[in-house]
Amino acid sequence: MEKYHSDQEYEEVITDQLGDMQLRENLRSAMDTLRANRKNLIKNRYSEWENLRELGKEVKLKILSRLDEYLELFEKNATQNGFKIHYAKDGDEANEIIYNLAKEKNIKRILKQKSMASEEIGLNHYLKEKGIQAQETDLGELIIQLINEHPVHIVVPAIHKNRKQIGKIFEEKLNAAYEEEPEKLNAIARKHMRKEFESFKMGISGVNFAIANEGAIWLVENEGNGRMSTTACDVHVAICGIEKLVENFDDAAILNNLLAPSAVGVPITCYQNIITGPRKEGDLDGPKEAHIILLDNNRSNILADEKYYRALSCIRCGTCLNHCPVYDKIGGHAYLSTYPGPIGVVVSPQLFGLNNYGHIPNLCSLCGRCTEVCPVEIPLAELIRDLRSDKVGEGRGVVKGAKSTQHSGMEKFSMKMFAKMASDGAKWRFQLKMAQFFSPLGKLLAPILPLVKEWASVRTLPNMDTSLHAKVQHLEGVIYE
């Protein structure tokens, strides 16, 4: 489960990540590849990409506008299909439901497909404390589980590791011969996982789309582990955020056509798993029981807000991370949240409280690239600006925990004075002259002045040079008026 993170904690982890040159090299190489793949695919294959984005936006906004009705419809149809539906108001309830299902059947080992919802609720840690092993089956998730790390990316969990590092991890943790060729590394993981599939009785997955009209769930993946996790075990449990609903298969297909191109620059994922319930009479495979946990975890409160509800449109493609100039320098771990990158900056304070994630809105350059590339047109940059306003007490104050993050009266007064000076040319030039004169004294006092000491603890105040205004006047060939 998520916890409070101080500004100092953020400063330490960001400094550490920036100093890891191998991490930065790995991230930059991966981000460059993902961006190029997306750009080339859209250019060569999707002449109506912007129209498709608009359709995707409409699909999500339609479902969010009547989510309560669609939840009831989904529950009715899924129940008729044989699913057992559970509602969880938060992560604690979701974890307890899964534990009780396992306890009831004396299950001590559980297979897991990649699921950000399970990361959000801290499922693996919870089960471990209860004496139950949760075994990851996604290749990226397996890698980070072996080294006890959290996912660094919402689509590619181990994207911060190169093949040589992965080879060493497999050598140390799986007692395999050192390899660094991707095909051989995959073979090592496959051999390890095939043994696991034979002995597990419960499989846990996420959900990409929950189809209200059909009472079915749709899972996409590239490795086949999802199909094994949901069909080879006696019990399948799917954790589904309530925002994952869509009305029908046509709507789901629109979002699916946006997902893979945006995520990794391919037309479609290798495996499309549409699950309509447990094994029926005459079926050769499939689980004997199928459960769906509909997870709220503060999503209802986000939905009720006139602006932030748009964040619930997210289809978890990760393209905003791939295009973010902050993320590709510091990676996902620096956000100290299940959800990193621009979408994480928006949803983490909503889900877990701005009081716990007060620093995260600062991890943004406000360049707006995330908004430009989002496949369902979430105005991420605008929402991040709103969060910053809420953080300092200048916004609507609707975010969970916002009241405890607001600036002091002195800070508010200082920023208002700065805004007045910065918007008046004459006052601004006068202040620049004063800043040049008092620059040495400012450097000396900055570490102890209440309003700037935190800033000064991680930054060096530069020498105030002659103003640009003055420099322009002395340029040859420039007429200054």
Show which residues each predicted segment covers:
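Predominant activation on well-ordered alpha-helical scaffold segments within soluble catalytic domains
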Residues: 124, 250-253, 318, 381-384, ...
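Intrinsic disorder at enzyme termini
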Residues: 6-34, 403, 410-481
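Ferredoxin-type iron-sulfur electron-transfer modules in oxidoreductases and energy-metabolism complexes
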Residues: 282-311, 327-446
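The feature marks the mature, well-folded catalytic cores of soluble enzymes
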Residues: 1-307
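Helix N-cap / loop-to-helix initiation motif
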Residues: 90, 320, 379-380
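A glycine-rich phosphate-binding loop feature that marks nucleotide/adenosyl-phosphate handling sites
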Residues: 93, 269-282, 316, 327-331, ...
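Conserved, hydrophobic alpha-helical core segments of structured domains
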Residues: 312-319
